[in-house]
């Protein structure tokens, strides 16, 4: 059980595939399992590993609260797919990635390439490019429910919502909203949005929303679901 070496491309690929149908490492809310895996990463995953990057940006938004997240933080080898060897206690093994679609792009290994070998290589390269161009591009999206809290009961909540909806980004679509009482006459704005994971992260949203500091005290992610 484990992800392998999360500082290697192979380990990050395992993490991406593990999170393809999950929002969190365990369960349906952020927990110490997410903290353990997050802390094992040396940096954000690259953009092409969009499931891993989406999860990384979401957990990063809990950085200030990570010590209070539920659960018990365990060793990294206790998380991840069961068919992956835990290499966290030793040097990660180098893995040889399989060629895409089992196509050999390079043909002969001889120093002097024959005309036939060159022709075969060119044909296989053209075949590979043709298959690659036919693969549909999947756009990963997530539905996010945000809780936006004002400073006090005198904050103009209509203006606050207007400020939020003025945030326009490629990959961001605002949805329905409502005011929810929180006590002492104060109401928070609960608003839905849909984002493209590789374009919009919760950390970017939080930065833009809290920039309206005259109206917004804080922003929290109330729910996060992959579409």
Swiss-Prot record:
<dbReference type="InterPro" id="IPR001326">
    <property type="entry name" value="Transl_elong_EF1B_B/D_CS"/>
</dbReference>
<comment type="function">
    <text>Catalytic subunit of the guanine nucleotide exchange factor (GEF) (eEF1B subcomplex) of the eukaryotic elongation factor 1 complex (eEF1). Stimulates the exchange of GDP for GTP on elongation factor 1A (eEF1A), probably by displacing GDP from the nucleotide binding pocket in eEF1A.</text>
</comment>
<comment type="similarity">
    <text>Belongs to the EF-1-beta/EF-1-delta family.</text>
</comment>
<feature type="compositionally biased region" description="Acidic residues">
    <location>
        <begin position="97"/>
        <end position="115"/>
    </location>
</feature>
<keyword id="KW-0251">Elongation factor</keyword>
<dbReference type="InterPro" id="IPR036219">
    <property type="entry name" value="eEF-1beta-like_sf"/>
</dbReference>
<dbReference type="InterPro" id="IPR014717">
    <property type="entry name" value="Transl_elong_EF1B/ribsomal_bS6"/>
</dbReference>
<comment type="subunit">
    <text>EF-1 is composed of 4 subunits: alpha, beta (alpha subunit of the eEF1B subcomplex), delta (beta subunit of the eEF1B subcomplex), and gamma (gamma subunit of the eEF1B subcomplex). Interacts with elongation factor EEF1A1.</text>
</comment>
<protein>
    <recommendedName>
        <fullName>Elongation factor 1-beta</fullName>
    </recommendedName>
</protein>
<dbReference type="InterPro" id="IPR014038">
    <property type="entry name" value="EF1B_bsu/dsu_GNE"/>
</dbReference>
<dbReference type="GO" id="GO:0005853">
    <property type="term" value="C:eukaryotic translation elongation factor 1 complex"/>
</dbReference>
<feature type="region of interest" description="Disordered">
    <location>
        <begin position="83"/>
        <end position="120"/>
    </location>
</feature>
<dbReference type="GO" id="GO:0005085">
    <property type="term" value="F:guanyl-nucleotide exchange factor activity"/>
</dbReference>
<feature type="domain" description="GST C-terminal">
    <location>
        <begin position="2"/>
        <end position="90"/>
    </location>
</feature>
<keyword id="KW-0597">Phosphoprotein</keyword>
<dbReference type="GO" id="GO:0005829">
    <property type="term" value="C:cytosol"/>
</dbReference>
<keyword id="KW-0648">Protein biosynthesis</keyword>
<dbReference type="InterPro" id="IPR049720">
    <property type="entry name" value="EF1B_bsu/dsu"/>
</dbReference>
<feature type="modified residue" description="Phosphoserine; by CK2">
    <location>
        <position position="108"/>
    </location>
</feature>
<dbReference type="GO" id="GO:0006414">
    <property type="term" value="P:translational elongation"/>
</dbReference>
<dbReference type="Pfam" id="PF00736">
    <property type="entry name" value="EF1_GNE"/>
</dbReference>
<dbReference type="InterPro" id="IPR036282">
    <property type="entry name" value="Glutathione-S-Trfase_C_sf"/>
</dbReference>
<dbReference type="GO" id="GO:0003746">
    <property type="term" value="F:translation elongation factor activity"/>
</dbReference>
<dbReference type="Pfam" id="PF10587">
    <property type="entry name" value="EF-1_beta_acid"/>
</dbReference>
<dbReference type="InterPro" id="IPR018940">
    <property type="entry name" value="EF-1_beta_acid_region_euk"/>
</dbReference>
């Amino acid at each position: 059980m484990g992800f392998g070496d999360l500082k290697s491309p192979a380990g990050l690929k395992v993490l991406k595939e593990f999170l393809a149908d999950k929002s969190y490492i365990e369960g349906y809310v952020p927990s110490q399992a997410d903290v353990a895996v997050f802390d094992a990463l040396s940096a954000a995953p690259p953009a092409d590993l969009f499931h891993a990057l989406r999860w990384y940006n979401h957990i990063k938004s809990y950085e200030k609260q990570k010590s209070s997240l539920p659960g018990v933080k365990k060793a990294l080898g206790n998380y991840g797919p069961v068919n992956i060897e835990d290499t966290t206690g030793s040097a990660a093994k180098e893995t040889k990635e399989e060629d895409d679609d089992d196509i050999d792009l390079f043909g002969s290994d001889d120093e002097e390439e024959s005309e036939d070998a060159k022709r075969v290589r060119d044909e296989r390269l053209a075949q590979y490019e043709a298959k690659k161009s036919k693969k549909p591009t999947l756009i990963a999206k997530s539905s996010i429910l945000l809780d936006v809290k004002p400073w006090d009961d005198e904050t103009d909540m209509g203006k606050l919502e207007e400020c939020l909806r003025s945030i326009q980004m490629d990959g961001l679509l605002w949805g329905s909203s409502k005011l929810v009482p929180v006590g002492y006459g104060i109401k928070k704005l609960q608003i839905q949005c849909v984002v493209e994971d590789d374009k919009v992260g919760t950390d970017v949203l939080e930065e833009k929303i809290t920039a309206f500091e005259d109206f917004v005290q804080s922003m929290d992610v109330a729910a996060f679901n992959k579409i």
